[in-house]
Every structure is written in structure tokens, then in C-alpha cells.
């Protein structure tokens, strides 16, 4: 998690290559620094490096509902909620510059936002954020659901990606049963089935 590259488009091969080169160079530099500045680390070697860099953010769909950071902060309740998750933000660089104060405030996001789970606050994810506006028989799960740039840093957690994935899978099965499009799925029935799978959804 040490090396980071900013301002790259993960859908462009040129940017992927640039990011790979930058991050691998950073790894070499930090290892060299540790070896030369810490006696106890003078003999360390690189055992392995991830086969490719991972992106925290990329394209997101335009869904029937776009989640916003304001909704998450307000703990907005939706009639079509399919997941509830602890309030958590982890964004390395909203503006591609590492100069933030680690807090979420206003719309002038800068640098580094990191707010771990500190209390009982949660946010909900509506089913509509999984449903694209223009494609009838498609559901999207994970970090690419419909959300704004900063809200994405709260929804990209792996466990929440799993929850949206489970909801999408159950909804797809329900759509087949009901012979309906994804937007027409009976959300109350979807929520009922998710609760049977021990998913904690408000009544």
C-alpha cells in the first residue's frame, strides 16, 4: 500500500503502464532508504511485489439514484435499501494532491481523507444505485455503482462490495422469476429475501 500514483485513468493502457513504472520505482526507493537509514533493516530484500497495481477509483455508472457524501453523512434512509454499512471514508487524493487534513468537510476536498469507524453511525445503499439508467437488464455491484467521487471512498470497501454483489445476484434471480427488468423488480420482495440471508436491512 505504500506506493501511490495519482491522476491516472485505469481505462487507458498508457496510464496503466505509467502507474506500474512509477509505483515499482517508489518501492525500490523506499527499500533503499530503509536499508541505508536503519541498521536493523540493512539486509532486507524485496520478497515479492503485486503483479499489477490496483485502482481505488475508476468509472461509475449513471444509476437511477446517485449516492452523495451529503446523504451518507445525514444517514439518509431509503425505501429500497439493500445494504447498511458503518460510516467510513478512505480516499488518498480527491484532487490528486497529498495536502489534506484527513477530514471530510465542505466541497473543497483536498489531499487525504481518512476517517475510520469511530462510532455507531452508518449509511445505507439504495437498490436504485445498482440500476443503470439506460440499460434494462444490467445490475452493477461494487465500487462502480452510482455515487459521487467522494462517496465512492466509503462504498468501495470489500465487504460492502460483497453486500452489493449479493443484492445484485438475488435481484437478478428475482427478475428472472418475475419476468421483469432490473428496474421493475419488486424491491420489498428483494429486501425480504436479503433478510433471510441475514442481511441487516431496516424494516
Regions found by a protein language model. Name each.
Residues 1-203:
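Flavin (FAD/FMN)-binding glycine-rich loop and adjacent Rossmann-like elements that form
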